[in-house]
């Protein structure tokens, strides 16, 4: 990134996105922070996102949007719980108080409102605030990106796609970060199963910028959902040099790479990626995305019969401190995978019990509201599966199978729970569950023809003589 290209006060105003500060340095550092967020990359030459935020707040300690982006990025990282992190709770409270005492533009006030909503677990209201900004300011990349992430956490695939469709025509290829706008739109297309168009738009973005890790990520999803394993392997290998520099998405792209190997039954190759990339990057970053990917990968391998207990124990050191965060159900479910895999009964029990407590008095937090009817029974199903009570796991998961989107994430990420339901049904001693497993596999084969993983499971079902 070229620091000379970052916008000062006048440049932001010229773009119709005025910032309430007189500090040109603060404006440029805000732009640098936003650019790194949009590109999934901490640029060491700029000091990374944390360095830019620190310098920005020193340049103008009263810059409301500087504090808004700082709190917003920490919150969407989902690694800090407002209930447990007094410093973060204080930052959000000070942001709201600071905004109330200053003369801000309506756009800036909506940004503060969005951050406050998100902080309190009102994710839908947060997205509404960012969408309100985009009605008048369709080139506000911060609002675009925060809404995109918000919809992702909500599992709202169509709004995630349409949010980008509404603003894309206001941009041109000459505007900085345009390729990343295309890549976000391509991901929305992929998640709404428009695979041909998703691949086309993503590759247009990659042609403009081979280092667009999010565009590469969309193509990886397309190959996964089509069960095009060899094409996926070839694509990831041919584009690795571009996206491996995107430190905030690189581990996730390696995770996608590993899924192709798991699908093909090439477990040693998958474990090599886990050891050399996924786990290494997870330990280095402490990022929730990297963490949940590592959890999911081991859980999938274990369901395939691979012994990964030692790796679970190593990963537990990363996930255990977040046992009681309960920021996202998606995170909780993945942390439980590792606690169960590492045979840490106390940690597993504490995670489920504290989630149950929040579900009983959720307040306005959407994740806690969803916990009672979705998150907690999914956790209980995983515990039942771990204890060998496969019939109970089926009975808990079966009524929820069309509601899994509510935990957020992508189709590819949530597929681990569909696999769990199939494995539970196959292992249940009840014939009706085994017949249900066969039906699930017929569905799976129709949705993703030529899946080697599905074929292996069908062979297992056939061996039961259902």
Label each residue range with its predicted role:
Residues 54-60, 96-102, 131-138, 166-175, ...:
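Solenoid-like repeat scaffolds
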Residues 66, 109, 142-143, 177, ...:
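TPR alpha-solenoid repeat register
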Residues 249, 254-320, 332-335, 340-341:
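A conserved active-site cap/scaffold subdomain adjacent to cofactor or substrate pockets
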Residues 45-49, 88, 126, 160, ...:
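Single-residue signature of alpha-solenoid repeat helices
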Residues 39-40, 77, 120-121, 154, ...:
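Structural motif corresponding to the intra-repeat A-B loop/turn of tetratricopeptide repeats
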Residues 22, 27, 35-54, 58-105, ...:
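Inter-helical turn/loop elements of alpha-helical hairpins
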Residues 377, 385-466:
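C-terminal non-catalytic interaction modules
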Residues 24, 31, 35, 69, ...:
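"A position-specific structural signal for the A-helix of alpha-solenoid helical repeats
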């Amino acid at each position: 990134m070229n620091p000379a290209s970052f916008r000062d006060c006048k440049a932001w105003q010229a773009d119709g996105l005025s910032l309430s500060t007189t500090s040109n340095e603060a404006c440029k550092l805000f732009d640098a922070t936003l650019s790194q967020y949009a590109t999934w990359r901490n640029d060491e030459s700029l000091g990374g996102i944390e360095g830019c935020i620190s310098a920005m707040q020193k340049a103008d300690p009263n810059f409301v949007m500087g504090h808004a982006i700082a709190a917003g990025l920490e919150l969407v990282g989902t690694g800090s719980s407002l209930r447990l992190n007094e410093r973060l709770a204080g930052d959000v409270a000070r942001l709201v108080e600071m905004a109330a005492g200053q003369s801000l533009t309506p756009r800036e006030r909506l940004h503060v409102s969005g951050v406050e909503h998100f902080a309190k677990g009102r994710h839908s209201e947060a997205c509404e605030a960012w969408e309100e900004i985009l009605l008048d300011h369709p080139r506000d990349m911060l609002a675009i990106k925060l809404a995109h992430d918000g919809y992702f956490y909500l599992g709202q695939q169509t709004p995630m796609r349409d949010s980008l469709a509404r603003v894309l025509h206001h941009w041109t290829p000459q505007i900085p970060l345009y390729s990343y706008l295309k890549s976000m739109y391509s991901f929305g297309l992929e998640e709404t199963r428009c695979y041909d168009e998703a691949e086309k738009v993503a590759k247009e973005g990659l042609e403009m910028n081979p280092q667009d890790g999010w565009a590469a990520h969309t193509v990886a999803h397309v190959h996964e959902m089509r069960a095009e394993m060899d094409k996926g392997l070839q694509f990831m290998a041919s584009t690795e040099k571009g996206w491996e520099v995107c430190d905030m998405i690189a581990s996730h792209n390696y995770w996608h790479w590993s899924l192709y190997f798991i699908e093909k039954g090439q477990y040693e190759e998958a474990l090599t990626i886990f050891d050399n990339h996924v786990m290494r990057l997870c330990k280095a970053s402490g990022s929730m995305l990297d963490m949940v990917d590592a959890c999911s990968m081991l859980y999938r391998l274990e369901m395939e019969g691979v012994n990964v207990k030692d790796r679970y124990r190593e990963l537990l050191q990363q996930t255990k401190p977040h046992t009681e965060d309960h920021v996202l159900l998606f995170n909780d479910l993945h942390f439980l995978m590792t606690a169960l895999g590492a045979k840490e009964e106390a940690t597993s029990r504490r995670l489920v019990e504290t989630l149950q407590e929040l579900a009983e008095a959720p307040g306005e937090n959407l994740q806690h509201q969803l916990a009672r009817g979705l998150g907690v029974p999914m956790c209980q199903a995983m515990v039942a599966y771990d204890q060998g009570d496969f019939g109970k796991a089926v009975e808990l998961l079966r009524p929820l199978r069309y509601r899994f989107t509510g935990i957020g994430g992508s189709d590819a990420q949530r597929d681990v729970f569909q696999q769990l339901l199939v494995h539970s049904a196959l292992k249940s001693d009840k014939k009706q569950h085994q017949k249900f497993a066969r039906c699930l596999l017929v569905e799976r084969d129709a949705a993703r023809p030529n899946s080697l993983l599905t074929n292996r499971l069908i062979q297992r079902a056939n061996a039961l003589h259902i």
